Amino acid sequence: MPRGRKSRRRRNAKAAEENRNNRKIQASEASKTPMAASVTPSTPEEYLSGPEEDTSTPEKASSTLAEASSTALVQKPVTRSNFQGTKKSLLMSILALIFIMGNSAKEALVWKVLGKLGMQPGRQHSIFGDPKKVVTEEFVRRGYLIYKPVPRSSPVEYEFFWGPRAHVESSKLKVMHFVARVRNRCSKDWPCNYDWDSDDDAEVEAILNSGARGSSAP
C-alpha cells in the first residue's frame, strides 16, 4: 500500500479517536450539570418565572401571574407544531389561578387576568380565535375545567374549578411547582385561601430543593 494512503488512514483514525474522546468529555460534563440548568423547558410551567414584586393581595398576585403567563404564551413564534403547547400554557395559567384563589376562581377574575394577555371573551384572538370558546367549551368538554354558576348569585355569576382530567394530569404538586417558578419563591408565600398542611410543606420543600427557587426562564 502506498505511503500516502497509509498516512491518510492513520490521520483519519487519530481524528476519529479524538472525536470519541471529546464526546466522552462532553457527556461527563453534562452529567455534572444540574438538570434545571441543562434542560430546555418543555412543559408549560417550566416557561414561567415572575419578577419580584408586591403580591400582598389576590389582585396583585393574579397580575403577576398574568405577566408571567404572557412570557409562556409569547416565548417563541406560534406554529402548527407548538400551538398545542401554547394552549397548554393558557390552561396551566387558569389552573394556577384557580389554585391560588382557593380552588375556585370567578369568571370575572379569570377574564381580568386573560385580558392582560390580550384575550377578551367574544373577541377574536390571533392565536386562539374566540378565547371564550376555548376556555368555557373546549377545556370544559375535555374535562380540564368545570364551569358553573355561583350559588345564589344575582345577577348570575360563573366560576371555574379544576375538572377531573386536570386532577389526573396536572397534580397539585405540578401546579405548586408552576406557582413557585412564577414567584421564584416558596408557593405558600402567595396570598391564597388554600389550607396548607404538613404534607404540602414537604412537597414545596421538595420543589425548592429541586431548584425551583433559583430557576428562571431562558
Swiss-Prot record:
Residues 61-71 have a biased composition (Low complexity). It holds the Pfam family MAGE. Residues 1-13 have a biased composition (Basic residues). One of its GO terms (cellular component) is nucleus. Residues 1-197 form the MAGE domain. InterPro entries: MAGE, MAGE_WH2, MHD_dom. The keyword Cell cycle does not apply. The modification Phosphotyrosine is found at Y194. It comes from the Eukaryota. GO terms for biological process: negative regulation of transcription by RNA polymerase II; neurotrophin TRK receptor signaling pathway. Keywords: Phosphoprotein, Tumor antigen. Residues 1-71 are annotated as: Disordered. This is Melanoma-associated antigen H1. The lineage of its organism: Eukaryota, Metazoa, Chordata, Craniata, Vertebrata. The gene is Mageh1.
